[in-house]
Amino acid sequence: MKGSNIRRWGAALAVVIIAGAAYWFWHDRGTSGSGAPAAGQGPQGPGGARHGRFGAALAPVQAATATEEAVPRYLTGLGTVTAANTVTVRSRVDGQLLSLHFQEGQQVKAGDLLAQIDPSQFKVALAQAQGQLAKDQATLANARRDLARYQQLVKTNLVSRQELDTQQSLVVESAGTVKADEAAVASAQLQLDWTRITAPIDGRVGLKQVDIGNQISSGDTTGIVVLTQTHPIDVVFTLPESSIATVVQAQKAGKALSVEAWDRTNKQKISVGELLSLDNQIDATTGTIKLKARFSNLDDALFPNQFVNARLLVDTQQNAVVIPAAALQMGNEGHFVWVLNDENKVSKHSVTPGIQDSQKVVISAGLSAGDRVVTDGIDRLTEGAKVEVVTASSGEQAQPAPRQSGKHGARS
């Protein structure tokens, strides 16, 4: 029984020894078959990352070069598109609406016929006024002929002086009647003209407010249609009161200030116009001031009551040092960036940021054009550490990026 146990333990030990030898053989063979790292480089780690002198993998980072650009300075505010002019087209006379001469949404010119009121009664009134005028003109002409005869007869005492004066008064009276008749004719003609309702301004016609055949009057507040002038069109937007001095200073420079209208999401520029005016008082409730910009809007990109984001260009900073916004970091001591030297070693530089948006930021101090800054992989960095500069390509493993030479050193 004891000998049997010894044999079983011996067999198990032999199996373990054989398995260990096989593992050592295949492991040593796989190691010798792999390529040796290049001289001066550590062995590659998982994913192809290079190792340092003591076997530690170099941190992969992405980098960008600081550039020198002309950077515009914008003041931004929320705005609403408003028509340059809005007119409710109403009838000036009472009558039946015979016809409409526009398509809803159509662009019209000032003077274009929009609607026609039944002119029948106004034609009759004009004819009556013209008839009365003709009658009174004949009376005046007869009175003047009589006056001429009286002036001759008074010289021979065939008529008295009083009769002459009476005739002169009759001529003056008849002349006054004719003037009144002429005014009545003009009034009747004006009433007739008003049966043709025309566009008072250039603009876009809205939806009709009344249908053909309805009796309308000059007192109707609804009107026939609303006309809005959209060529040009305005944008009214607000800025905080702290921006007033900047706007006024830019206006005093004597050049037109450009205003951009962006969509609700602030991702697409809709149109570009010019600042038209600045309101004369601040809204005490909101602490803001209203501004109005005008756009040609020939492409009809802006529509009345549309919400937009307005950007007012007040200045352009020349020769500004610009880096990607992702490179700018914030720490306990303020803003900083990680700068790469020619050996791909990183160092932390304190900087003073200036104008910035979601993509770029201007560095007012602490950096020079040509400096390389880290934009990704920042959380793995330590002062003086050597890194691997890579570029990320969609769907592929990051590859080493070509090193860009440039001016280095902090900008004071």
UniProtKB/Swiss-Prot annotation:
Localization, per the record, is: Cell inner membrane
Q: Which InterPro entries is this protein grouped with?
A: MFP_biotin_lipoyl_2, Multidrug-R_MdtA, RND_pump_MFP
Membrane topology of this protein: Peripheral membrane protein
- Keywords annotated in UniProt: Cell inner membrane, Cell membrane, Membrane, Signal, Transport
Q: Could you cite one Gene Ontology molecular function of this protein?
A: efflux transmembrane transporter activity
Q: Does the keyword Cell membrane apply?
A: yes
Region of interest: Disordered: 33-53, 389-412
| Superkingdom, natural source | Bacteria
UniProt KW Membrane keyword: yes
Q: How does it assemble?
A: Part of a tripartite efflux system composed of MdtA, MdtB and MdtC.
In the record, the note on similarity to other proteins reads: Belongs to the membrane fusion protein (MFP) (TC 8.A.1) family.
PANTHER family linked to this entry: MULTIDRUG RESISTANCE PROTEIN MDTA
Q: What is this protein called?
A: Multidrug resistance protein MdtA
This protein's gene is called: mdtA
